[in-house]
Amino acid sequence: IYPEDTTVNFVSTLLEEFGDEWANKWMFHCRWARDIDQIASAGRIAQLTQPDASSEQLEELTEQVRQRMVGRVGFVGSNPETAPQIEASLHLALKQLEIHLESRPYLLGGRPSFGDFSLWGQLYNVWTDPTNCALIEAKMPSLLAWIQRMLWPRIEGDFESWESLKPTLKPFIKAQIGE
């Protein structure tokens, strides 16, 4: 998961850090910003924590989870003022990653990297909620394939050079992280 090439290894580490520090904002904001996503997510959490609960108990627990989590979106910097920026950042990232992943199975080539795992963890969860699931499944087949591939990642080739990654990965890095 650690490329030998120092530049590509740095990019992997940069993507890992980005996934932990910014992409979690996408997931958390989107999960708790809209009723449809709140209900779906809270329902999954309730079902996972109480698999033997009755329908009535699950409804009650779902609402408890929902109320608790919606009130926490501010912890990741999500509020009415920042919501448009968080969502615009996510939508641009999804488009950029779709383009980048059209020609390779993983972010840095033929095998998963440290960066894949971090970013995937957030985007997998973005995909499990109805609003963004509909977007990804309708318009982003390469990104969807990567999300699903990362459930059981395997080596399919080597890491690519920075020169081969740069045309489609640098725009993502520039827009999301900076120059």
Where on the chain are the PLM-derived regions?
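GST-like domain detector, emphasizing the conserved glutathione-binding G-site
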Residues: 1-57, 107, 127, 179
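A non-catalytic, amphipathic alpha-helix used as a structural packing/dimerization or gating element
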Residues: 7, 11-15, 85-92, 96, ...
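Structural signal for well-ordered, non-membrane alpha-helices
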Residues: 20, 94-98, 151
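Intrinsically disordered or highly flexible coil/loop and linker segments, enriched in small
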Residues: 25-28, 103-107, 132, 156-160
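Divalent-metal (Mg2+/Mn2+/Ca2+)-assisted nucleotide/phosphate chemistry catalytic cores
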Residues: 33-87
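Short N-terminal edge-element motif at the start of the domain
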Residues: 73-107
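GST superfamily/GST-like fold recognition
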Residues: 107-127
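Active-site/pore-lining binding-face segments in mid-to-C-terminal subdomains
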Residues: 120-179
